[in-house]
Amino acid sequence: MLPMPQKSSSRPTVSTIARDLGISPATVSYALNDKPGVGAATRQRVLEHAREVGWTPHSGAQALRRGRSGNIGLVLVRDPEEVSREPFYASVTAGIESATSAHGYELLIRFVGGGEEHEIDVFRAWAHRRRVDGVVLLDLASDDHRPAVLEALGLDFAVLGHYEGPEDFVRVSTAEPEDAATVVEHVAALGYDGCLQVTGPLAYAHERRRLELLRRLCSEHGLAHAHERARYAISSGQDAVRRADVTFCSRPAVIASSDLIAVGALRAAAALGLRIPEEMGLVSWDDSLIAEVASPSITALAREPFAMGRSGGDLLVRRIEGTASRGERMQTAPARLVPRASTARP
């Protein structure tokens, strides 16, 4: 029987485990780090006792052994309060953290205002102080300078989402063409004769790509197309739909780039006296609990942002540790359409 662990308010260490078990710290260290020189029975005793006392590896010590900081960086050029209400980014960030922590890395998150230059300032500070081993990039622009800056700084990075540019870095690409086709085919099949597309800022490459795809697909399906821009916020989505000319077709469907924009579209439709789904349809490019509980509930694309973030975090760690080749690319699965009350036949 294992001796009872000594009660202590301090963090369990290799030395305290060795004292509890009556063996040397070196033996405990070899067992915990899966190194040779320890018998199977002893290794099992050490692992079981470590679990009992709640021992976890010290991230700082691990980083020193690896010659790295042990940190992954993520900079969001957004208002923190706005991000806190944005389910997509919360899910992506949780996915990144899930992957990086599984490899023993800490995720450092910074919020900055003022655009790309302020974000690059953070990257330079991190590189100068050796605070991070790599960076996850989100929301790339068509003429994004961040990859070149990170290359010059010697920081590994992974790109999440659509990007138009060199492909010699690791990335997780989204299935924008397939998702756009799913949306247009759905609204066309239900008798809507036009798409009012409300995108986020067109500085983002993925928003420009979605706009290009929907314009082409609407033309191919004989549907009218109109476009408005918004921020990823309910009030902005509401303003975008209210200022749109909704008479560009007889029965439009709003295609919103986020669930918050979609909720804003619901409010605008009510203010305009348009019945959803009878007179106006609504589809969100992002699914969430918000889309599910809205009234009426919102048809949406289930894109699994948590899995996307986890894939990106894992890919970056593998790049840092030399097990992912330069230019390695992962592709997210096409989204699954979740039909709800905001779209229906007339």
Predicted feature locations:
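N-terminal helix-turn-helix DNA-binding module of bacterial transcription factors
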Residues: 1-70
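Short beta-strand segments enriched in small/hydrophobic residues
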Residues: 27, 68-81, 186, 194-200
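Amphipathic helical "hinge" segments at domain boundaries
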Residues: 55-121
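Hinge/beta->alpha junction and helix N-cap segments in small-molecule ligand-binding domains
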Residues: 79-91, 109-118, 172-182, 198-242, ...
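Short, well-structured alpha-helical segments in soluble
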Residues: 118-131, 237-248
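Flexible loop/hinge segments that line or gate small-molecule binding clefts
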Residues: 138-181, 260, 286-298
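Flexible loop/turn connectors
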Residues: 225, 246-346
